[in-house]
Amino acid sequence: EAEAPSGKIDELTAAAKLLEFRSVDGGLKDTSFDTISAAAGHAALPHYKVDEYSNITIPPGSIFLCDSGGQYIGDGGAGTTDITRTVWVGSADGKAEPTAEMKDRFTRVLKGHISIARAIFPEGTTGGQLDTLARMHLWEAGCDYAHGTGHGVGSALGVHEGPQRIGKTTGSQGGTMEPLLAGMICSNEPGYYKAGEYGIRIENLILIEERQIDGADEGTWLGFENLTWVPIDRTLIDIDLLTPEERDWVDHYHACCREILGQRVADLGDDRAADWLERHTQPL
């Protein structure tokens, strides 16, 4: 946020700095996959892999997408992470703003992400049945994305681990017809990609767990518990596109981010990080 608007940071540097931050945790054994550090048009490639030949400077006044994760084994247990955030990189003079189209697409992706996160469904429901929830807001604008909405995640094992998957049942990858069961972990990662210009993806990991619903029919009902707590870039949100319930979800999510991360940041004694967290978790 402070340095990228100067045009002095490139994709490789950003990925290396992220690994440096992640390595502070002594339980880190490896990344869970090659970090997708994608600026501007590269962000429109969902599985872009930066190297010394493709590496570009992150342009001021552009979108930057970062998809990363780690494999952890330590005293606190073992686990695998996978997270994507899409952020707006401003300009040195502070005047660069995302276009109306960027904000529209980002907000529609966010609405899909929220729809999955808030879903309640009966036991036996498949990922293929839930997939439409993530896409319907993009479909209303004649848009879509050509990858799955979610994949299973292991525990210090494969970051893509079956049998479950959330996606179109017509896709080439299996798992969308597998029932979603309590205890499974999935990703929640709708996106949008405009070739040659920018890409958007918002990804959290979610745990399937039982839900108690007053007055519900007999049977077991399930929902998702969020596992990932990193602020979502408010600069790219068109608040007018959100329903009151969606605004409440974003505000609650950011309040949880502030509560969960706040003490950890305080323990580090990093005033700049504390200020960043405070600013990026304010209510909409």
Locations of the language-model features?
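Active-site neighborhoods and metal-handling regions in enzymes and metal-associated proteins
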Residues: 1-284
